[in-house]
Amino acid sequence: MKERMLTGARPTGKLHLGHYVGALKNQVELQEKYETFYIVSDVHMLTTKSDKQYIDQMYQNTIDMIIDCIGIGMDPNKTTFYLQSNIPEQNNIFCLIQNLIDIKRVEDTPSLREMSKHSKDDTVSLGLVAYPVLKAADIIGIGATMVPVGKDNIDHILVTQEIIKHLIKNMVLIILCQILLHRLIIMLLE
């Protein structure tokens, strides 16, 4: 049985060469090795792109993103594409696990500091602060054991691992996810 991998993107605009080189090319190769789920993270998009113009474009961006992914070689017979907001159970998981992590832990993540720099009025939404916890809900919700990320998102996976450890110790047994950093698998918890 193949390990389960979660990958995806926010439908903030058109995919470009940077997406291909930075992630998609690798994901095409990884779909051969892993049971692959590609999440179109529309809820995550709202944490930084909640203006009407982005919401109005989200539907078309979602369609274009999936078409582009298939066009570059992601096989819908090997990769399950899904829209984050279409899975209500993910929100239930998020509501539970947000109580398992200290807010200071997520406020201190480098990715939050970087993403908050792009705020137009120097404010940070609660949704943006909770971004790593929502990502953890996505990972836990489908039982992903591998998550390909760039260096800028390793802290999200570390938050996920902390939440999973708490769940294993205090609540339920689930599989601990690992970071898949492009071609290098980093085993943080051996």
Q: What function would you assign to each model-found segment?
A:
Residues 113-190:
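Active-site cores that bind ATP or allylic diphosphates and position pyrophosphate for catalysis
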Residues 2-137:
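N-terminal Rossmann-like or analogous alpha/beta NTP/dinucleotide-binding catalytic cores
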